[in-house]
Amino acid sequence: MREGSFPRRIGLLLGLLGLLAGVATFNIDTKNVVVHHMAGNYFGYSLDFYHEQKGMPVLVVGAPEAESNNPNLAGIRRPGAVYACSVNRATCREVHVDKMKGNLKKLNGSHLVPIEEKSHQFFGATVRSNDKHDKIVVCAPKYTYFYSKFEVIEPVGTCFYAENGFDNAEEFSSCKQEPARHGRHRLGYGQCGFSAAVPGKKNQNRVFIGAPGVWYWQGAMFSQNIKNQTDRPNTEYGSKEYDHDMMGYSTATGDFDGDGIDDIVAGVPRGNDLHGKLVLYTSKLKMMINLTDEVSTQHGQYCGGSVAVADVNKDGRDDIIMGCPFYTDYGSVKDAKTQERKPQYDVGKVIVMLQTAPGVFGKQIAVVGDDQWGRFGHAVAAAGDLNLDGYNDVIVGAPYAGKNKQGAVYVIHGSKDGVRELPTQKIEGANIGHGNIKSFGFSLTGNEDVDGNGMPDIAVGAWKSGNAAVLLTKPVVTVTGQTEPESALISVEDKNCDVDGKLGKQACKHINTCFKYEGKGDTPNDLEFDLRFNLDDHSPEPRAYFLQKDVKSDRSIKVAQGSKTRDHPSSIEQRVRLEKGRQKCFRHRFFASSTMKDKLSPIHWSVNYTYVESKTGKLRGDKLEPAIDTTVPLSFQNKINIANNCGKDDLCVPDLKVTAVADREKFLLGTQDNTMLINVTVQNGGEDSYETKLYFDVPQGFEYGGIESVGGDGSKSAPACSPTSDEPDSDGKWTFACDLGNPLPANKVVSSVVRVTASSDKPPLAPISINAHVNSSNDEEAHTVADNKVTFTIPVDFKNQLSLNGRSNPEQVDFSMTNKTRVDAFDDNEIGPVVSHLYQISNRGPSEVDSATLDIFWPSFSTEGGHLLYIITEPVVNPPNKGRCRVKQLQNVNPLNLRITNEHVPTEPPVAKTPNEYSREEDDESYEDETTTQSQSTRHQSTQHQTHHQSGPVHVYEKDEEKIRQNTGNWQYVEDKKKKGDYEYIPDDQEYDGDDFEEEDDEDFDRAGSKRVKRNPTPKKKKKGGEHRGEPRSDKARFSDLREAVKLSKEAGGVVDYKGPLSRASVDCNSLRCTHIECDIYDLKEDEFVLVEIFSRLYTNTLVDEKNPGGDISSLALARVTSTKYNLPHKPTLITAVSTNMNAIASEEGRDLPWWLYLLAILIGLAILILLILLLWRCGFFKRNRPPTEHAELRADRQPNAQYADSQSRYTSQDQYNQGRHGQML
């Protein structure tokens, strides 16, 4: 359900904005900062507050690379220095604590030589005072000592302790011990003073010194008695597994066993297998416990790099804050593009370890930094109670966080549960002073009220830019209040106030809001606040507005920036002045729009308050302005419900149910009907359903075509539907949302029909998933939501049933075994009768076929190489726009260049042209002959003949397959004398291939001048092992494959599915004595077909010469689908053979005619002759006078157009006379 999701998001956003505002500014003042600066000497490397004189604090700042002006250190190069700086103005002075003049010298033999070196000793690297800031220790961890034998120079380190000023400072070098305990395996590289802590309870006369370099850098803690130089016990040496742990890297004191005496906590950043840890010791250096990270430990995080002690939860027990500056956050940030977790390196973290009982730290709280490479936790310090809420707070330094990596300091407030998990304030170095501070937060200190306002202040060091800053804490103002409606409900039908002339009367109500504030610290008696009222702030579009005339009538009110409307604003601002401790109330009127859609969700509003700060950040009397307490709510919220028909409980619980069914069980691709209807029914069996929406997915490959809702009365209305996003989802689906009613009443049924249309460019190929669900803004019962969604799948199929049929015309041809036709034939009708094979390729549908191929293998030659079915024209295709054919062996079309008499063309076509006329541009280049080129006359003759047939009537044959389908026999044959009509083309023990025949050219020429080709076949016996000379490649079809295909068609009685080796590419008719006709068929829709007819003449002389007794001659056709719009498997190849039966008779006279036909023909001829004689006699034909014989002689040489008579009484023209044909000229 959608209710509540948007309000939760808005609430979360407002909370986040409030948090960010609190983080940016709370009560650490950043406008009036005292910034000290010294460049080039690491000024700010360490610092702490110290009461140099009673009641007069100063900020002691270390500069370990400084050139000291202490006269006792004259000639010492960069020994380092410590400065006492004012807390209220930018002035500092160097403090001289080293009273020894120069380096100490001792006799080495007879010479007095230095036994120590103070140059580059890093004096001021450690500055630490106690809790009361009346004792202080400053150290030089790189101080070197030569020992009594002057054999080594080792960095033992040294420290100076002072109280009540710096005049009586005393030096302690705990690692410098005689007799010689030098060397890295002892104390020589101890660097005593790397860290230090001064206890503050029960007058402990000790200082705790950290020495991380002793004993192969295992590290140690020294308890130095400030009254006795030699009273300096240290922690024990450990086994070698603790080498390089560097205990003493950081140090702090606190009571960890409940005895009231400060104990020691030492940081060990490389301990615990490089995870880091803390080690706790009593004041007498008795080990108590090890503390490790139990929240989110990882290698190299450097836990223990810093440490501080404070009671953060006000339970009277000291808690420990441990810094882990190199912690990497692997989980909180996602990549914007890939949404993968993106590691944030060196963000750092601090772990607050709460002491739940003496010596027991039972709870840990981790606070993680927010800036990569920032090293949050590099420095930590107890800050005191900054906001005066009774809980001590902590400050954390991240010297490389913030803008331009200039550093930042975070304020973490204590609480009864420990600390708040997020910082309350973030102070960036870029916002301090002139904005040029770098490494801000490298060193920290706090818990000292330097301005006397009763609130602790803090100081921050930044060694990289040479700065130390004192930041003051502002007094805190805590605001309380409430906002209430005048009644719990508002009815949009109760229009009780006139808004304006355009909107007329609307339903109006009042909001009552009251505020007051209290102060902590030195706060003024009255303050100005800005109030912001946001109406209906949980809704994306407001439904309630303040009245414009009310806004204009009050000068303290104005339209708020960012208000979603201006004429009648949804947000207003008002500036008010409040008196401390006194409540003040305000009344505002609003109206609810009568045209709102969401009548179920309450109208929420919020009132935010902010304090109006001055530019200087100070009040009259040079006092700091107060800060708003961000630990309490910064806004107040309430709501008013909208009256509805939900009963006394004011809660409507619908019971929605959706069902859906498609108008088909299977979706067929490529059909004319590419639209699918989805019938969706939504029923509400519960109470009113508000903002009821139907969501449905338009599957990939479909386009949305509209929706109609059919009511119970049969009327149709179109609900408003729109896509839920501008882009489809990752699966290519669009989701549409349709409004069904607001509300959809109880027991209402809405039936809808969704229309989707398959895309022509990218149709659906996978099963279609239909998803629909219904939703409303009011929640259902949990057990009724299962029927709010429906999902089902419709399979996708592609069916195009390709059919192939053929027939011969005529089905039988009679030929004489005794009479041969003329050898030198001139016309095509002189070589034999016409034989045509007609093939029909059809698409039964329902899906469309984009392209298909039809390959016809034509028996042009006999086994002896003679012409058999002599092709007289190129194939005829009807309709011509649906396909075209090409004769691959174009030399086999009318190879003798006979004159075509066109006897094969019917004079009266049985049916007129087809009703669909198409136009397709001819592409002659793609049909260019691949093998040979005919003479110009032959090409012209063939083209002229083809044009004649394709431009003539279209022959439409019956579609009845039973009439077209033919039984087929063998393609070509040899005689079997045992049984007539049972023939095979090749004996079982022979196989013919293209290379088994040799061609010889006959030099005789026909009358048209074309060369004749005579083929003399010489069949070869198969060699042993199945190999023979000229065997084709394995991917080429053999003649036996053609024979088997014809046999399959014959046994099946026509067309049959074929999975054999024959294909367009595998059959080479140049070697198999056939003619290959390639046809490409286009765009066959359901029930469309293409006819391909091949016209030939039976070359009877070949049958007579080869003494063929008769049988079947068959052509073979292969058809297959080659392309559709869909990537789906095609049907297998179809084959069929068309046969013409050859019937051999003894002679022409041998035809079995009835005797009475002969008698009748003689009598009719005699009667015609008698009638003709009588007619001529009556006309006097026999009585005419004949001229003399000599005058009848005709001289051909005198009359050029005369006829020549031959000895056989035949006449011919002079230019066509031939003695061999016409005989002797008379």
From Swiss-Prot:
Basic residues bias: where?
A: 1010-1026
* Residues in the signal sequence: 1-25
Annotated InterPro entries: FG-GAP, Int_alpha_beta-p, Integrin_alpha, Integrin_alpha_C_CS, Integrin_alpha_Ig-like_1, Integrin_alpha_Ig-like_2, Integrin_alpha_Ig-like_3, Integrin_alpha_N
* Keyword Transmembrane included in the entry's annotation: yes
Which keywords belong to this entry? Cell adhesion, Glycoprotein, Integrin, Membrane, Receptor, Repeat, Signal, Transmembrane, Transmembrane helix
Family matches, as Pfam families = FG-GAP, Integrin_A_Ig_1, Integrin_A_Ig_2, Integrin_A_Ig_3, Integrin_alpha
A molecular function (GO) held by this record is:
transmembrane signaling receptor activity
Composition bias (Basic and acidic residues) maps to 1027-1040
Q: Where in the cell is it found?
A: Membrane
Q: How does it assemble?
A: Heterodimer of an alpha and a beta subunit. Interacts with beta subunit pat-3. Interacts with dep-1. Component of an integrin containing attachment complex, composed of at least pat-2, pat-3, pat-4, pat-6, unc-52, unc-97 and unc-112.
**Entry's family note:** Belongs to the integrin alpha chain family.
* Name of this chain's protein: Integrin alpha pat-2
Q: Which organism is it from?
A: Caenorhabditis elegans
